[in-house]
A protein has these predicted regions:
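Bacterial N-terminal signal peptides
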Residues: 33-42
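Protease-domain processing segments flanking chymotrypsin-fold serine proteases, especially trypsin-like
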Residues: 48-138, 185-280, 480-483
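Extended extracellular/luminal ectodomain segments enriched in beta-structured repeat modules
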Residues: 144-151
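Short, surface-exposed beta-strand/strand-loop-strand elements in extracellular ectodomains
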Residues: 160-173
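Serine endopeptidase catalytic core focused on the charge-relay Asp
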Residues: 197-404, 422
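Catalytic nucleophile loop of clan PA
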Residues: 277-287, 409-431
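C-terminal cap/linker of serine protease catalytic domains
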Residues: 311-343, 347-357, 378, 436-490
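Beta-propeller-forming repeat regions
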Residues: 489-517
Length: 517
């Protein structure tokens, strides 16, 4: 359900197991895409920077005579989140690494600080009705002085039929960057909606519903996440820190183009970045299973945003990537502490135009004779790293494969959870920790898929139930295009959700036959 742009550093978030806690609904969100839409055609103003598909502009920007006659934005109430504390702004990830953070390469990359709020259309903002009397419009501005970006967590989202929600920025009185509209189709069982990131220190929230359904809108803003680092982050585009990172746009990655498409930048709880990978399964049914590090998993899976295709336009740019291909929300599937493996299921299929790939995997225990890592170091554009020597097994950070010293490339914060591909281009692990960096000969450690396969012996602590749901016993599996022809007679995209309802539980099956719907 969202978009993005940001960057960051910070220490590791404490990773507790959500699977050990009551989780009455499971989490999820809907997928949207980005297409450049010239709102100038609607308003006569300059072209907006649009990062999601927007079939219509917010009513604030509509020029339809006699319809969207709304008060100027200057009259819309503002919810002021406090400026970010100086202690947070002063934090330096580079100094933490210099001080000997042994797991710097295996930690999330913090870019924002959350501020909890409790704002609803009944308590905040301003209601108006369009001149034709048909549409009720609620608007609220959210701001935090000094923030470089904002993203929002709606801890309650129920949109009535015909309703729409936008979040956008304004510059010089003009709507600039727009997310939405979100609609009734974005109502999920968990009842939440988390947005991607918009640049700047202020955003406008605008909901428009049929006038007769105003009372059916159930919206609660629960978190304003205040960005304190830009994306791309300063310092990685030049200098010694970035000197060894290899753009996937470069010819070095030509033999791994499919694998590159399987990797996404993972935004966690609106405050941190990691990396993850889409994995294939043996059923022949396309299911968006997304693996990352356990320590990257959020307390609420609804809060994740995955950005696809965040890459340099050409080799050597180390920037210029676009965050326009994204989707939000997921369900917890499995996690295993001893391998730091985490598995989510994205609650909507990736859009066709995102052109993603389901990576293959290997669990037969064979030691890779060489390896490739694909990742987003410090939430930067996608990079690729190469190890030409055989790997070894290690017990550091749990049951891991050790990359003793990358022959080309390195990792950093934000690379955490990224996949390790063996010589046959199959995933054998995800990044758990390490000291790897440009300019050193330190190791990285990847939680082993072979060990996480049986994990803790339960459905919630092992991968086998999800990657081999039919129990075929396969030890290796090739990858496949998400957009390829179906391999079974089942629906093109099928998900079985376990929904808890008090003391009762029941299975709900969702089938999505239209990937563009």
């Amino acid at each position: 359900m969202s978009l993005g742009q940001a960057g960051a550093r910070f220490g590791p978030r404490v990773a507790g197991s959500r699977l050990d806690r009551p989780d009455p609904t499971r989490d999820g969100c809907r997928a949207l895409s980005a297409a450049a839409v010239a709102f100038a055609l609607v308003s006569g103003a300059g072209e907006a920077q649009v990062r999601v598909r927007t079939e219509e502009a917010p009513l604030t920007r509509s020029a339809a005579p006699g319809v969207a006659v709304l008060a100027p934005l200057s009259e819309v109430p503002v919810l002021e989140a406090p400026a970010i504390a100086a202690s947070i702004l002063a934090y330096s990830e580079s100094s933490a690494e210099a001080a000997g953070d042994a797991s710097a390469a295996g930690q999330p990359y913090r870019f924002a600080d959350p501020f909890e709020v409790e704002a609803t259309p009944a308590t905040h903002g301003r209601w108006e009705t369009t001149a034709d009397g048909e549409t009720a419009v609620w608007r609220l501005r959210a701001a935090s002085a000094g923030s470089v970006s904002l993203n929002l967590g709606f801890t309650r989202y129920v949109m009535p039929p015909g309703g729409r929600l936008w979040v956008y920025t304004v510059r010089d009185g003009e709507v600039e960057e727009v997310v939405g509209p979100f609609t009734e189709a974005d109502n999920e069982t968990h009842g939440e909606l988390w947005t991607p990131i918009l640049d700047g220190a202020e955003v406008v929230i605008e909901a428009a519903v049929p006038a007769g359904r105003r009372g059916e809108l159930d919206l609660r803003l629960g978190s304003v996440n205040r960005g304190f680092r830009d994306l791309p982050p300063e310092g990685i585009g030049s200098g010694s820190h970035a000197s060894c990172h290899v753009d996937v746009a470069c010819s070095d990655a030509d033999q791994h183009r499919d694998q590159v498409r399987s990797v996404g930048l993972l935004q966690v709880s609106g405050t941190e970045f990691c990396t993850g990978v889409l994995l294939n399964n043996t059923s022949g049914v396309r299911i968006p299973l997304f693996a990352t590090a356990r320590h990257c998993l959020p307390l609420r899976a609804a809060s994740i945003v995955v950005y696809w295709n965040y890459e340099s336009a050409q080799c050597g740019d180390r920037g210029g990537g676009r965050l326009t291909d994204f989707q939000t929300g997921a369900y917890d599937r499995a996690e295993h502490r001893n391998t730091d493996f985490g598995l989510l299921e994205l609650d909507d299929p990736p859009r066709t135009e995102h052109n993603v790939y389901l990576a293959g995997w290997r669990r037969d225990g064979a030691l890779p004779t060489s390896a490739v890592g694909i990742h987003h170091p410090r939430a930067h554009v996608k990079s690729i790293s190469f190890e030409d020597d055989p790997l070894s097994r290690s017990l550091r950070y749990g049951f891991t494969f050790e990359v003793a010293d990358w022959d080309k490339g390195a990792t950093a914060r934000g690379s955490s959870g990224s996949p390790l591909f063996d010589q046959d281009k199959r995933v054998v692990g995800v990044l758990s920790g390490g000291r790897s960096a440009c300019g050193n000969d330190e190791s990285d450690y990847y939680g082993r898929l072979e060990t996480a396969w049986t994990g803790g012996g339960t459905r919630a602590t092992r991968l086998s139930d999800w990657l081999d749901p039919g129990g075929t016993g396969a030890t290796t599996l090739g990858g496949r295009d998400w957009n390829g022809p179906p391999e079974s007679a089942e629906p093109l995209y099928a998900v079985a959700l376990r929904v808890q309802d008090g003391a009762r539980s029941h299975d709900v099956s969702h089938a999505f036959r239209d990937l563009d719907g």
